[in-house]
Every structure is written in C-alpha cells, then in structure tokens.
A protein has these predicted regions:
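C-terminus-biased signal that marks the final domain/tail of proteins
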Residues: 1-320
C-alpha cells in the first residue's frame, strides 16, 4: 500500500476499541465536543473536528497532492477530487519502482487540468512554413510567485488557478529511501537525496554504509544565500531556468535524467565493488569506497548545475 499525508489531517473515524489499529488520547472526543469542534451527534471524524479542511479552505481530508499521487498509482479505483475523503492508503495497480516515486516527486501536473500554465498561451509563427501556432509561453513556469499570479489574474480573472504542486521551489531537500534486504546492509539501503526544487534537481545516491558526507551537506542555505551551502549549488541554475522555462526545461530535465540513469546503472558495480573490498581489505575500506562514491557523484552534479547556471546567465544577458 501507498499512503500520502502532505501537511494535512487525513485521519477520519476512530475505533479506539480496535487497539491494534487505532491509538488516540482518552479525551480526543470530549475535547472536540467541549471546544465546539464536534456536536456529538454526527459521526466523529478526526480531520473534520481538528482541521476542518485542507490549506485551501476546502472541506476535505486531502489536497491535490494526495489525490494526484494516489490516483496516479491506483487509477482503477477511480478516485474523485470531489470526494470529501480519500483512503489513507491505496494498493497500487502495479508494483511501484523507485523511479516511479522520483517521478511523482517531480510532479507539477503538466498537461493535466491542474497545470497552472495551461492558459498562458502565445502565438508563434514558423519561420519556414509561415504558419502560426499557439504554444505555452516560454516565460510561463509552474513555480510562479504570488506577485506574478496576482498580475496575470488582474489582467484577466481566472487566468491562473493556484494549485499546490508536489515539487516546489522552496523545498530544502527531499529523499527517496530504497531498501533491499537481499543485499548487505551497507549497500542494501540507499537514500536518493535531492536539494532544492525536486522538479529540477538531481538525486544523489547515499548508501547505508557511507560514513561521511561533503561538508556542504551540513550547511543550511534556506535563510540566506551561501556559496558553501549545498542547496545553492543547484538553486542558482534552477531559479534562472524559470525565467524562460520553455527554453531551459529540456536542458534541466535532461541533466536530471542523466544522473538518475547514471546512479541506477552504476548500482551493480557499486554493490560488487563494496563486496570485493570487504572481502579483500575489510569493512572500513569498503565503506570508504561508498563514501567516496557519493562525494564524487555529488561533485559531478554540482559541476553540471554550475555550468547550466553560467549558461543561463549568458542566455539572459540582454534581460529577463
């Protein structure tokens, strides 16, 4: 089963007699009634009493993120966004691969009814055929800020509907944990770590046996710009790319795909090399190899994102 709870109350009814499946404070019902959150007559629903709805004010026990992911993994259930509740978890229609999870964390709902750029069209003329076509504006991107959204909707009401994306630019980091119990612990567990916007940044494999990480990983860059903070190794290129996302996204997406394929395709080598070193030189040397591999992989991604940042600055030299 797959469950999603993205900063929202998802729990519905409570059966505290079923101690194997439910646990709550003894006063969970009485406090709700005392505070006027529940009238004591209609069936008690935790999310309705203590939350009332999602962060857009809709009286639901879910938001677009929960709906989109659960529906993507179990389309046979025919879940509806118009529902008041969705299942806490669903059984996927087919096995979920680590790449499926990575792809879901990159979601901006492009090409769906939830796509925030769907109405931002411009007419372009083909230089060769002289025919005019309508495309999404190169200046449109799914991570537009409040000022831009207000301006667009001020020009024409309803141009852009704000939707909470899975991938957001204010993200500090995200990770996908892959566990494989048939391998030695040191290589069986892998954390695929990404910094900044998961819709634009690469994932770095960190194995369970890794004993140290590059110094930049330990420095926060969320509150100010810091060249020594890992998040800013990617954020500069990512932010610049949104200036004309229609022109830059292919390059960003290509780099993300390259490192995803690189990490996955090199895993058998890493696993075998770890075992060889463990047998010949001991556990400490084998773990040092894993540590070095992650550092080298991270370094390669950093270099590529720095190159793209330089390229984007040059691309926009005449103005944004």
């Amino acid at each position: 089963h797959v469950g999603v709870s993205a900063n929202i109350s998802r729990i519905s009814t409570l059966d505290l007699k079923d101690k194997d499946r439910y646990m709550a404070s003894e006063n969970v019902f009485s406090v709700a009634k005392k505070m006027g959150f529940w009238d004591g007559k209609e069936p008690f629903k935790f999310w309705k009493a203590y939350s009332g709805g999602n962060y857009f004010g809709e009286p639901k026990a879910f938001s677009i993120r929960e709906y989109f992911i659960l529906n993507a993994l179990a389309p046979s259930l025919k879940l509806s966004y118009d529902s008041e509740e969705l299942p806490i978890s669903v059984k996927p229609d087919k096995p979920v691969a680590v790449t499926d999870v990575m792809a879901l964390l990159r979601q901006t709902y492009e090409g769906t009814e939830w796509d925030m750029t769907k109405n931002l069209k411009v007419a372009v003329k083909n230089k060769e055929t002289k025919e005019t076509d309508t495309i999404t504006s190169p200046a449109a991107n799914p991570w537009m800020g409040t000022d831009m959204l207000n301006m667009l909707n001020g020009v024409k009401e309803g141009t852009v509907t704000r939707n909470r994306l899975v991938a957001v630019p204010q993200c500090s980091y995200s990770h996908v944990i892959q566990l494989r119990n048939w391998l030695p612990d040191a290589v069986g567990g892998v954390a695929w770590l990404s910094f900044d916007n998961p819709g634009q940044s690469p994932r770095i494999p960190i194995f369970s046996g890794t004993t140290d990480l590059p110094a930049a990983f330990g420095i926060c860059g969320q509150h100010r710009h810091r060249e020594d903070a890992i998040v800013w190794k990617y954020r500069t290129a990512n932010k610049l790319a949104t200036v004309r996302w229609g022109l830059t996204k292919e390059k960003i997406n290509g780099a993300v795909a390259h490192f995803e394929e690189k990490g996955l395709s090199e895993m058998p080598f890493v696993e075998n090399r770890y075992k060889e070193l463990q047998d010949s030189k001991g556990e400490e040397t084998a773990r040092a190899f894993l540590t070095g591999y992650t550092a080298d992989f991270a370094g390669a991604t950093i270099l590529r994102w720095q190159e793209m940042a330089d390229e984007f600055w040059k691309m926009f030299a005449r103005g944004f």
